[in-house]
């Protein structure tokens, strides 16, 4: 970690009625970065958010804020604010009073409240909406109000619990850019929870991929997409062709009944492995020129590319994204570079990362 540490979990476990929802998790976060907690429902991502906010306490382990344990610090004393999935706005208050609510609780002077609310609304592009009623706001505008209400208190960390999930696709995409730009302008730490892989890849400095209460992988969006650590991450982050194989030697792997040059090393000879090739890294070719030959089973036009699904002679399914079209029933070749092959160690079902 190169920057200033703001949050650290040391061997944190959370149980509910004997059920482990977060299992011996350790990590650290830097000030001023955009982090995403990504995973399927029930993986533990919202539990981490609630632990940071102080809404729940860990069963085991320690949580640090600026190097000091915070277990006994109540939520209202932590330099943390949360934007909830449903925004949790007050329908009987206008935009100004929703944003000012926390400042009034702190008994701040009226002049200071006006100044801070105006600054917060300017940050989220809602100047002039001060007296608008919440019922008159669109979904995207309500989300901006919720964010303004959170940042007006000048938190060091902003927690966002799936705040885009209720928006339509176009608005969700717009808000991704707005949130990322807001984080850069504010310079505070954002911790964003989502199950949407594209959101995580588009917005984050760093991503935690979680499954079954454990962190499977941590890294930049590019690291996690290009170098998934196991089959779960490869399958969860984008579309993938995942095949069972074995490592013959350094830079030589066998899968789909053939041996291929690759860029991976450090495996035992003949070690069982999982092999990942992304659909966009496959190129259509004539059957005689293909490293793999498939029979096309289905074809979908996705606008920017065709999505082609087929099977090789060993029954392995292949997914291809190509600007070239192939007909259902046609036999085609697939070509790929050694750099497109990613070799992963096989993990047992009960293993974490």
Curated annotation (Swiss-Prot):
Q: Which PROSITE patterns match?
A: ABC_TRANSPORTER_1, ABC_TRANSPORTER_2, POTA
Sorted keywords for this record are: ATP-binding, Cell membrane, Membrane, Nucleotide-binding, Translocase, Transport
Residue intervals of the ABC transporter domain: 7-237
Q: Where does ATP bind?
A: 39-46
Q: Does the keyword Translocase apply?
A: yes
- Catalytic class of the enzyme: translocase
Enzyme Commission (EC) number: 7.6.2.11
In the UniProt record, does the keyword Transport occur? yes
In which compartments does the protein localize?
A: Cell membrane
Query: What is its membrane topology?
Result: Peripheral membrane protein
Q: GO molecular-function annotation terms? A: ABC-type putrescine transporter activity; ATP binding; ATP hydrolysis activity
| Catalytic activity, reaction form | ATP + H2O + polyamine-[polyamine-binding protein]Side 1 = ADP + phosphate + polyamineSide 2 + [polyamine-binding protein]Side 1
Taken from the UniProt entry, a GO cellular component term is: ATP-binding cassette (ABC) transporter complex
Q: What does this protein do?
A: Part of the ABC transporter complex PotABCD involved in spermidine/putrescine import. Responsible for energy coupling to the transport system.
Q: Tell me which family the UniProt entry assigns to this protein.
A: Belongs to the ABC transporter superfamily. Spermidine/putrescine importer (TC 3.A.1.11.1) family.
NCBIfam families xref list: potA
What is the protein's given name? Spermidine/putrescine import ATP-binding protein PotA
